[in-house]
Curated annotation (Swiss-Prot):
Family named by the database record: Belongs to the UPF0210 family.
Assembly description: Homodimer.
InterPro entries: UPF0210
Protein name: UPF0210 protein Ddes_0622
CDD domains according to UniProt: RNR_PFL_like_DUF711
High-level lineage: Bacteria, Pseudomonadati, Thermodesulfobacteriota, Desulfovibrionia, Desulfovibrionales
């Protein structure tokens, strides 16, 4: 039972701490749009998106105004295009991507995800065509996001796909060189990708999902930080004893509970008004570049001088676990990624730590072993070899595969820039100093190709 004080603290979140719902994402299945005729297929796709998404933005705004809780992003996810557009080659995939971009703009949404392929065990024709089309497709569209799943705990790691994605990431960067390689900010490589992610760039609608569905991404890193700051100022827990990390975990858990209840309430009302089923609430703490809306600042509230200091991985493990516990108690419909995001360019505190040399790619990789997602929004030198990018991807995929968790890589090679120089992507994507990549050469390892087998599911040590 929530006390009067906790009810008041929830009201304070709304009035003074900028609590928001980070995204309401409409999932639309495109399997009933399939055709061997490209023109008919794209017409079917646009018609179906128009039918279900035309009121999405206005309804989200109405519900947000009703409760005083803004819905920051309105998005769409669709069935994996490599599957539903399998008959078409790379040129056809580019045309499909442009048609999706037009549909997203017509609906008024921020992004549309699902230009995706699932290749953890091998390539189908549609997968190869989509991956080949990525540079042109992402360069010629504004709102399309792509995700490629190259590994899973049951299938292992498709190293041929890892090698290919290392090359394609560089090609996407070159195709968008005039914008700092921003195409790579809309491309993410996954292990164990969930089917119901509302967050970009990994959102797509899985084959086991409903025909249409509303998924919501809650947020609130700033709210969590302020709750921790209040607890630290008080210095004692509810029983009057000195504050410990156990008490701080309880503060995070209770805050996550309240944030999740708010997010689910918004999502279910939007779904009801649209006449669409509600799917899941993704519990992820998702930062923005704004000061006060940072995951990195939470580490300072828990006693570290900065994210990246010794103890960072332990704090992240505690934070991630407490968020999940609080969110799972608040909702029976938890899904997506549900953890803490650590995107370098999108979080002012993380970006500052990386610029100061307190965070390396190696440290970020260690952190991903205890949190959701992975190496996210990291700017690297534009002349980074493809094999190095593939090696970084392989390392991150191995963490996900062995630990039965989702991990991902979103690296941005910035053409013409080197370590220490800055790149700005604008808006929620933020800015970042270019980070050095690990030394050494992975070329011979990557060219071996094939598949790293799935791990044994007993003998856990």
């Amino acid at each position: 039972m929530l006390s009067e004080r906790e009810v008041i603290s929830t009201l304070n979140m709304l009035r003074n701490e900028h609590l928001d719902v980070r995204t309401v994402t409409l999932g639309v299945s495109l399997f009933d749009c399939v055709s061997h005729d490209l023109e008919l297929f794209t017409a079917n796709v646009q018609a179906k998106i128009r039918r279900y998404a035309s009121q999405l933005v206005s309804v989200c705004d109405e519900v947000g105004d009703k409760y005083g809780i803004p819905v920051v992003n309105k998005r769409i996810s669709v069935s994996p295009i490599a599957v539903v557009a399998a008959p078409f080659g790379p040129d056809g995939m580019v045309r499909v991507c442009k048609a999706l971009d037009e549909a997203a703009k017509e609906a008024g949404v921020d992004f549309l995800g699902g230009f995706s392929a699932l290749v953890e065990k091998g390539f189908a024709n549609g997968d190869r065509a989509l991956i080949e089309a990525l540079p042109e497709a992402l360069a010629q569209t504004d709102r399309i996001c792509s995700s490629i799943n190259v590994a899973s705990s049951r299938s292992g790691i498709n190293m041929d796909a890892v090698a290919l994605m290392g090359r394609q990431i560089l090609r996407v960067a070159e195709a968008t060189a005039d914008r700092g390689g921003i195409g790579c900010a809309k491309l993410v490589v996954f292990a164990n990708i969930p089917q119901d992610v509302p967050f970009m760039a990994g959102a797509y609608l899985g084959v086991g999902e409903p025909d249409v569905v509303i998924n919501v991404g809650v947020s609130g890193p700033g709210v969590v930080k302020k709750a921790l700051d209040r607890a630290r100022e008080a210095g004692r827990n509810e029983k009057g004893a000195p504050l410990t990390l156990l008490d701080m975990a309880e503060v995070i858990k209770r805050t996550a509970y309240k944030v999740t209840r708010v997010g689910e309430m918004i999502g279910t009302e939007v779904a009801t008004r649209l006449g669409i089923p509600f799917g899941v609430a993704d519990l992820s703490l998702a930062p923005t570049p704004a000061v006060g809306d940072s995951v990195g600042e939470i580490f300072q509230s828990l006693g570290l001088s900065s994210i990246g200091a010794p103890g960072t991985t332990a704090v992240l493990a505690m934070l991630n676990d407490a968020v999940k516990k609080g969110g799972a108690f608040a909702s029976s419909s938890v899904g997506g990624l549900s953890g803490a995001f650590i995107p370098v360019s999108e979080d002012s505190s993380i970006e500052a730590a990386a610029t100061a040399g307190l965070l390396s790619i190696e440290k970020l990789e260690a952190m991903t072993s205890v949190c959701s997602v992975g190496l996210d929004m990291i700017a690297i030198p534009g002349d980074t070899p493809a094999a190095t990018i593939s090696g970084i991807i392989a390392d991150e995929m191995a963490i996900g595969m062995i630990n039965h968790k989702t991990t991902a890589v979103r690296l941005i090679p910035v053409p013409g820039k080197g370590v220490g120089e800055e790149v700005s992507f604008g808006g929620l994507l933020g800015k970042a100093a270019i980070m050095p990549v690990p030394g050494g050469n992975a070329e011979d390892f990557i060219t071996l190709g094939g598949r790293i087998p799935a791990p044994i599911h007993s003998l856990k040590n």
